[in-house]
């Protein structure tokens, strides 16, 4: 029988090896308790090390953001379904600040403010994230706004131009066409996208804040119909969402846009609308028992919007030269632009496009009030061709509005005033556009130039839009060389301008107004009638035009 021997050295070595390789499967967590909850706000005790804006995890994987850091408890906004959060439940720290996934995979998708897809098209694969609260580009990291961003809307591109990197406010009462103007600007980027050149392409982000779900679906359908979802991301926080989602949605949109901007790409972000974000933030602040100020808004509501809109920039060439252009929308009540939120955002932005309900109801659409709409970037954000032809347009329209108001009380007007009223009425017609029908910059330059030359003066006001549409179709055929020379917004030279006028004069000879009249002067009409040999006799009313 073998003798059993036990070596103390072997036992000691085995124990040492085991203890050296042992790693305890334990983690240290800070856990707090919900003390009370209501309307998407929870107060949590027992998390002394929590940071401002840190993500907290509630039962069921629901997230919250720590906003109030008091001595004994935390005030948190719940992001998601807050109805199942109850007093006494455990809350854990995550150690992370709120961030969203970013990248080209988001193009063509509809997401919520947490970056999660809500369009039923599957998960979005992205390996990169970006924090929602980041410092905007510094002064030295920027360059002046000089590159135009064409909206396809004649009244904006001619009189209140928008540049890449600008913040242009769209403001007006409800149902005045604010969303339609911004969607047109998105649709107009399709031609740039199809070039495949990243220096021309503009990626678009539409942020819907507090809109009806059906309205957001309508916007998505309009973008899909025109093929614009290919380069667009929709961040949706509909009216049914909690106040926390409505508060965060604009920051999510700008974070996704900033990612592309720092890659040297161009981005357009539409915030529709920031009034509802401010109202959501007011609700959150009041529930967190923060002291209210003017109109019950908290004291930092200005900072809410300024830190968001300051992220718009045209980066320096050293950082890639990318840009983030913002079109924030603000809803007014009874055209009152002096209310708290409108004045705040007007002071932050680089200009505003004011849409007036009276003009809208008169059929002037887009209903842009030329008098108080302004772009602080101005001609620097216009192409040479547009700058050359639109110089006097704004002044003429402003004078027309003033004279129109005066003429309502005047019994008799001199010939010059009548001529100015006639010209102004035709300019107003010329600037009207159908919804979702952006116009290429070349057509805009031609139309505005010919209007300045008096080509439309002999056209009845009711026929101006039909005359313009048929004229542009004809010029594309007969003056294609002119269009080629002004492609991309280049300036009209004297020879091309002369060719345009000559081609237009020929077209006018064939155009018949809806009342049967010719749009040429009396002598030209007589000559044309005399030359109609072998044709059926037509009784033509002649429009007398004083040139």
Swiss-Prot record:
GO cellular component terms listed in the entry, alphabetical order: plasma membrane; proton-transporting ATP synthase complex
Annotated binding of ATP, by residue: 172-179
Membrane topology qualifier: Peripheral membrane protein
PROSITE patterns (UniProt xref): ATPASE_ALPHA_BETA
Top-level EC class as recorded in UniProt: translocase
Catalyses which reaction(s): ATP + H2O + 4 H(+)(in) = ADP + phosphate + 5 H(+)(out)
Gene Ontology molecular function, alphabetical: ADP binding; ATP binding; proton-transporting ATP synthase activity, rotational mechanism
CDD domains, sorted: ATP-synt_F1_alpha_C (cd18113), ATP-synt_F1_alpha_N (cd18116), F1-ATPase_alpha_CD (cd01132)
Cystine connections: none
Key word rRNA-binding present: no
Pfam families found in the cross-reference section: ATP-synt_ab, ATP-synt_ab_C, ATP-synt_ab_N
E.C. designation(s): 7.1.2.2
Site (Required for activity): 373
Keywords of the record: ATP synthesis, ATP-binding, Cell membrane, CF(1), Hydrogen ion transport, Ion transport, Membrane, Nucleotide-binding, Translocase, Transport
Key word ATP-binding present: yes
Family: Belongs to the ATPase alpha/beta chains family.
Functional note: Produces ATP from ADP in the presence of a proton gradient across the membrane. The alpha chain is a regulatory subunit.
Protein name according to UniProt: ATP synthase subunit alpha
Organism this protein belongs to: Rhodococcus jostii (strain RHA1)
Gene: atpA
């Amino acid at each position: 029988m073998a003798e059993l021997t036990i070596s103390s050295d072997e036992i000691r070595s085995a124990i040492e090896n085991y203890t050296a390789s042992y790693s305890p499967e334990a983690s240290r967590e800070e856990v707090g308790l919900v003390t009370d909850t209501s309307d998407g706000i929870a107060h949590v005790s027992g998390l002394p090390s929590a940071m401002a804006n840190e993500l907290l995890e509630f039962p069921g994987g629901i997230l919250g953001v720590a906003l109030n850091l008091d001595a004994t408890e935390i005030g948190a906004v719940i992001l998601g379904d807050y109805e199942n959060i109850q007093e006494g439940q455990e809350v854990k720290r995550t150690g992370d600040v709120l961030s969203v996934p970013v990248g080209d995979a988001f193009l063509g998708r509809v997401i919520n403010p947490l970056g999660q897809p809500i369009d039923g098209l599957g998960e979005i694969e992205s390996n990169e994230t970006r924090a929602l609260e980041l410092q905007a580009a510094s002064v030295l990291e920027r360059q002046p706004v000089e590159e135009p961003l064409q909206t396809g809307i004649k009244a904006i591109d001619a009189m209140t131009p928008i540049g890449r990197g600008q913040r242009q406010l769209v403001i007006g009462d409800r149902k005045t066409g604010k969303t339609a103007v911004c969607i047109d600007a998105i649709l107009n980027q399709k031609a740039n996208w199809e070039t495949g050149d990243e220096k021309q392409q503009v990626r678009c982000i539409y942020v819907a804040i507090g809109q009806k779900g059906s309205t957001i679906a309508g916007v998505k359908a309009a973008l899909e119909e025109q093929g614009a979802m290919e380069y667009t991301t929709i961040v949706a926080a509909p009216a049914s969402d909690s106040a926390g989602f409505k508060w965060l949605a604009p920051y999510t949109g700008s974070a996704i846009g900033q990612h592309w901007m720092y890659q040297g790409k161009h981005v357009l972000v539409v915030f529709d609308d920031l009034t509802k974000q401010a109202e959501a933030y007011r609700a959150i602040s009041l529930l967190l028992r923060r002291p209210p100020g003017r109109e019950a808004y908290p004291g930092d509501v200005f900072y809410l919007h300024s830190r968001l809109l300051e992220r718009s920039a045209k980066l320096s060439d050293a950082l890639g030269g990318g840009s983030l252009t913002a079109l924030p929308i603000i809803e007014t009540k009874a055209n009152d632009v002096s209310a708290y939120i409108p004045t705040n955002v007007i002071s932050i932005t680089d200009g505003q496009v004011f849409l007036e309900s009276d003009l809208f109801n008169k059929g002037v659409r887009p209903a842009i009030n030329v008098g108080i709409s302004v772009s602080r970037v101005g001609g620097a954000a216009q192409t040479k061709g547009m700058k050359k032809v639109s110089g006097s347009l704004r002044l003429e329209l402003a004078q027309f509005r003033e004279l129109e108001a005066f003429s309502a009380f005047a019994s008799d007007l001199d010939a010059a005033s009548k001529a100015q009223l006639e010209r102004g009425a035709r300019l107003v017609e010329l600037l009207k556009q159908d919804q979702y029908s952006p116009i290429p910059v070349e057509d805009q330059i031609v139309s505005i130039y010919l209007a300045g030359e008096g080509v439309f003066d002999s056209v009845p006001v009711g026929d101006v839009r039909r005359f313009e549409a048929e004229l542009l179709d004809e010029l594309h055929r007969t003056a294609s060389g002119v269009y080629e020379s002004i492609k991309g917004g280049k300036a009209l030279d004297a020879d091309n301008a002369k060719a345009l006028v000559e081609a237009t004069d020929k077209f006018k000879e064939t155009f018949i107004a809806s009342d049967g009249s010719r749009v040429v002067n009396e002598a030209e009409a007589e000559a044309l009638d005399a030359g109609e040999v072998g044709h059926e006799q037509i009784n033509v009313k002649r429009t007398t035009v004083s040139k």
